[in-house]
Amino acid sequence: MAFHSLLLLCLAGLLFVSEAGPVAHGGEDSKCPLMVKVLDAVRGRPAVNVDVKVFKKTEKQTWELFASGKTNDNGEIHELTSDDKFGEGLYKVEFDTISYWKALGVSPFHEYADVVFTANDAGHRHYTIAAQLSPYSFSTTAIVSNPTE
């Protein structure tokens, strides 16, 4: 039985990763340099209505709220920021996992899942941050691409 559960989880992960690639938002003048995608690994479908906050580290080494949103029916958030505002720096994406699971009647272990990353240090890039959630674990991955790809 454990083998079947593990197999289903792996298949859900493959589906998630295959659909987590960058989405075209108008070609070279794309206004979507940061996109978030969230999958509910327990139910095997997009995680809808997950609150997400993006913070940027300041010169004073504190985190300042940079952007926020809520995942749509596809488990995605587009247009969190624009190319002009998304400069080089250290960013943190915070997924509010406790609110998501409690709304489904589940008591989770984690309150938040955070992804901290350096953006645009090697030139301007577009980022897709993907998270796969379950009540007691989470995994993340990122797809980094040139805006013209």
UniProtKB/Swiss-Prot annotation:
Residues annotated with 4-carboxyglutamate modification: 64
Tissues with expression: Detected in plasma (at protein level). Detected in liver.
Gene Ontology biological process terms in this record: purine nucleobase metabolic process
Residues the record lists as binding L-thyroxine: 37, 76, 139
InterPro entries attached to this UniProt entry: Thyroxine_BS (IPR023418), Transthyretin/HIU_hydrolase (IPR000895), Transthyretin/HIU_hydrolase_d (IPR023416), Transthyretin/HIU_hydrolase_sf (IPR036817), Transthyretin_CS (IPR023419)
GO CC entries: extracellular space
PROSITE patterns with a match to the protein in the record: TRANSTHYRETIN_1 (PS00768), TRANSTHYRETIN_2 (PS00769)
Signal peptide from the UniProt entry: 1-20
Subunit composition and interactions: Homotetramer. Dimer of dimers. In the homotetramer, subunits assemble around a central channel that can accommodate two ligand molecules. Interacts with RBP4.
Protein name per UniProt: Transthyretin
Organism: Petaurus breviceps
